[in-house]
């Protein structure tokens, strides 16, 4: 997917990019490739791959969830900024917090944000488990999202505690998502969310399967979650 195809594909979905936004994506691609030479940010570095598998794939969440109706977004383990920064470029009003456990990625994100002139961005170097127990961040966000960070039973424990009651947990998954959802039923109920909507679709060009899950936060998360760093991954809620 080249830049023009990317612009056209978004237009078909009702997102018309301004010149400023087109330039922001171009700059994002350049910085990603440049910084990737000194640190491992992504295995995908060709233009067509980045525009499809990082930019378009990230924004695809907004085809099914209306980001224009929310303000605060937290992205857990965003790595090089996916999915939240492409979403932020398309929806500039958003206040975005990204938490990542690797400080060098936070350094990249700070630089990226400055270069793209993004406002209302907050980057936090922390383990998601500790971040979710911090009262400054816990149950503070309209939307908590993550893309391919961990299986859903683990991911939900890292993300759901950050969503406010009445907020949402939005998870972008590949084809294995359906199996993961079954395994995560207990975790999702325990943490206080219920499945609102589920969308299956294909990423254009390569036709790979994607599933987007939107969960409603219907009650507060019990204080014991998230548990200590590493525990959710070793022993998911069952």
UniProtKB/Swiss-Prot annotation:
Binding positions for S-adenosyl-L-methionine per the UniProt entry: 77, 82, 128-129, 147
Keyword Mitochondrion appears in the UniProt entry: no
Recorded GO CC terms: cytosol
Its biological purpose: Specifically methylates the N7 position of guanine in position 535 of 16S rRNA.
Pfam family, one: GidB
Gene responsible for this protein: rsmG
EC numbers on record: 2.1.1.-
Protein family per UniProt: Belongs to the methyltransferase superfamily. RNA methyltransferase RsmG family.
Highest taxon above the source species: Bacteria
Compartments, as annotated in UniProt: Cytoplasm
InterPro entries cross-referenced by the UniProt entry: rRNA_ssu_MeTfrase_G (IPR003682), SAM-dependent_MTases_sf (IPR029063)
Ranges that cross the membrane: none
UniProt KW keywords: Cytoplasm, Methyltransferase, rRNA processing, S-adenosyl-L-methionine, Transferase
UniProt keyword S-adenosyl-L-methionine, yes or no: yes
Identification of the protein by name: Ribosomal RNA small subunit methyltransferase G
Class of enzymatic activity (EC top level): transferase
GO molecular function terms attached to this record: rRNA (guanine-N7-)-methyltransferase activity
